[in-house]
């Protein structure tokens, strides 16, 4: 048997406790199966009953397609937090964020503890200790920081992060017709590239834990329901649900591919990190 020493990531936000040590002792040994694990985050994806209640959007076809493939879809689920950094730092460290943390949640100031806790988290640390490779996919946004333990990093970023491009588009540079400064095109490139690369994960011989953060259907919307660039004139809500439909299509295709190509049945988790967030409203952001 191999002894797996568990270190204590999570930074100062999640210091180790006695209960942690009791749950996973340092001499813990694991010799069971190691299926590939996929943790797929769809940023800003609403719960299906909330879509229907407030916007009369029927998402039942997608939900039923998941259940037919063996997924459990949790009813009435909701995020514990209303922003990506808070939500992911909590889930990846399997703990609530301390209530006395000095963070401005409305203006997203002093988010460094959350960013560090996402990059150096307990889930990845534990899985790597028992022999998993860590595959990380994101748009390089700070809220989904990859940390120092990544074995395979999937990114289509060439010049600047999506957030940097957003800032640049607020300056005089916004008039330059460069793809690297085009937020919509960059989002499209990142997402299409990400789905393509995830299809290659089942080819890896070693067991993998894949964390994949897709900035969809989060604003700015970059896809209509057919995968094309959204047309001008549609409302934010219409654009949001069009991108939901395209996200549904891509997730279904990806799940089918992973299930077909995996020698050992994988574990696949698909979730939203928070609810719908329009630029001028935080309505239903937790659901």
Task: Spell out what each predicted region is.
Residues 1-287:
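Catalytic domains that recognize anionic headgroups
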